[in-house]
Amino acid sequence: MRRVVGKRVLEFSEAEFDQLRSQYDEVVLDVGTGDGKHPYKVARQHPNQLVVALDADKTRMERMSAKAAAKPAKGGLPNLLYLWATAEKLPPLTGVGELHVLMPWGSLLRGILGSSPEMLRGLAAVCRPDAAFLVALNLHAWRPPVPEVGEHPEPTPETVDEGLAARYAQAGWQLTDCRYLAAEEVAALETSWTRRLNSSRDRFDVLALTGKINP
């Protein structure tokens, strides 16, 4: 595994991960973390959980990974790990109990929409039975449509069962709820997209999908 600590990239072995994992009750995995603010918030709020954040762009994680590695008095969080990796080629993680994919873009968006079943199955493979998932879709990807959405129409709570839920089920994901997020809920996600999205009562910009993996 390639651990990001500021501008440094350090090798992090499976044995080191297992030793760190043994100190916590649960593992939360944030895929496509971007600037890494969301996992920092989760790790700070849940010190009993090991939070693993990964992204294909290591430079975006530099600031928050350096902060997480600092002494606790300076904002350091020993339960937070930033990894340089992609969803297509995950590090050798096991026992993930909660999976977050927030505002996916590019190949990650394509995979989360079911165009890459291998990605969905790969994510399921690192999760324990009945792991929870949260996917937050930035609906601006359909306004106008970006190439990654392909032929998938903009999902809504009314239409999600017609296609996406079935594609998820084939990969071991059970979709149980789909709803629009209010502006304050979008802000609470603490992602780099938060400041760019302006949800309103007459135009919803973020759709949240929740459910279980390996039910």
UniProtKB/Swiss-Prot annotation:
The keyword S-adenosyl-L-methionine applies. GO terms for biological process: methylation; response to antibiotic. Belongs to the methyltransferase superfamily. Kanamycin-apramycin resistance family. NCBIfam families: self_KamB. Protects S.hindustanus, which is an antibiotic-producing bacterium, against self-intoxication. This is 16S rRNA (adenine(1408)-N(1))-methyltransferase. It comes from Streptoalloteichus hindustanus. The gene is kamB. It comes from the Bacteria.
